Amino acid sequence: MRLTTKGRFAVTAMLDLAMNAQTGAVKLSAISERQNISLSYLEQLFGKLRRAGLVESLRGPGGGYILAAPAARINIAQIIAAAEDRLDATQCGSKANCHHGAPCLTHDLWENLNKTINDYLGSVTLQSIIEQKNNGDGSRVVQFTHIH
């Protein structure tokens, strides 16, 4: 399993958007400059984020992007799901057909890892990251204490 650049950049760009949206729509060129992410790459990512209902685009003078919901209601799992084709630790894509049509010996292990990762990322919102950054506690985004 790998979190690709798409997922990482999408989370970074969404955090930037959330932190700079108080003054109105944010231009992708501004995010590109602040985060050192190519503008064309951001355009591709924001197309996916818009289709997933996480951002809205505003046209015209002063146009750009805004969050489609408050930062407290957008979690990291949603962002990664919109940007990545698939974030999955199983070899079979969670179809349980990895060993000649049947689940392999470690299928449940990887499925449980998927669930744990999704639970954690689903518990972390843009707002929680911003608050911890503003409080100077950037060393630990959100402590995950519930392991099955």
Swiss-Prot record:
InterPro entries the UniProt entry points to: TF_HTH_IscR, TR_Rrf2-type_CS, Tscrpt_reg_Rrf2, WH-like_DNA-bd_sf, WH_DNA-bd_sf
Residue runs in coiled coils: none
Gene3D superfamilies the record matches: Winged helix-like DNA-binding domain superfamily/Winged helix DNA-binding domain (1.10.10.10)
Key words, A-Z: DNA-binding
One Gene Ontology cellular component: cytosol
GO MF, one example: double-stranded DNA binding
Pfam families, A to Z: Rrf2
Annotated HTH rrf2-type domain residues: 2-131
GO aspect biological process, one term: regulation of DNA-templated transcription
Record's protein name: Putative HTH-type transcriptional regulator NMB1378
